[in-house]
From Swiss-Prot:
UniProt subcellular location: Cytoplasm
Official protein name in the record: ATP phosphoribosyltransferase
Record keyword Nucleotide-binding present: yes
Origin species: Vibrio parahaemolyticus serotype O3:K6 (strain RIMD 2210633)
Upper classification of the organism: Bacteria, Pseudomonadati, Pseudomonadota, Gammaproteobacteria, Vibrionales
Family according to the record: Belongs to the ATP phosphoribosyltransferase family. Long subfamily.
Alphabetical keyword list: Amino-acid biosynthesis, ATP-binding, Cytoplasm, Glycosyltransferase, Histidine biosynthesis, Magnesium, Metal-binding, Nucleotide-binding, Transferase
Amino acid sequence: MQTQRLRIAIQKKGRLSKESQALLKQCGVKFNVMGERLVVHSENMPIDLLLVRDDDIPGLIMDGVVDLGFIGENELEEVRLDRKALGEPCEFVQLRRLDFGGCRLSIAIDKDEEYNGPQDLAGKRIATTYPQLLKAYMDEAGVPFSTCMLTGSVEVAPRAGLADAIADLVSTGATLEANGLKEAEVIFRSKATLIQRIGEFDADKAELINKLLTRMQGVQQAKESKYIMLHAPAGKLEQIKALLPGAEDPTVLPLSADKQKVAVHLVSTENLFWETMEQLKELGASSILVLPIEKMME
């Protein structure tokens, strides 16, 4: 039955859509998104993907319409605060913070304006798409202000005379700079997250959710890890291990042609920079290979 299938909401378009789909595919979920279809059925698992607007996803989870959802923490918290203020259901379970979709919600002001802290915003009119997050921050700071609610092109509000400042999502700051603005205050940091509805699941759905979570953990660990192979002086093994924090102890094998050295294989959770490789070389390591890992399960 259709209701027995796991229903996952993902953003139809936008910054999180491609990466959410890519993560599911890396977890072995086969599907094909075509055209304007709003529901996509997995080819190999009892999973349905619902392609919806990002600001609809928290509500679908909180109302129990879907089982799981990929959403930015900024959008999730904005909707939660809004629904809480309206007395609507706003509960969910955060299953896993993901390693993509990083951004921050920041207050930006005219690039030539002096800024000493939130108190400088007292009495200002601030344009934003996130009124609840802005209000929560300003209320906590004890700063009175007024909101100019916009659904897009927030950065042009000061030049258009609509507002004195803005509160908008920032990734690099290039858009702010192009519009004569500068970042003054970070009010919320966000990444993509996987959330789940409140309530019980039957055994099959619960098992499938746990399987997906285990695979997601493996995908994320693989991204953060490297498989390293090198030859090392046997007497310097402990010093070399200290440079390469690993998931487990390394595999150490004798070399047939050189009894003074051993072959070392390990998975390192540390980013391996050129400086680290140079330090390894100084310790006598040679034939150093650093390889990416596609999948990983401990």
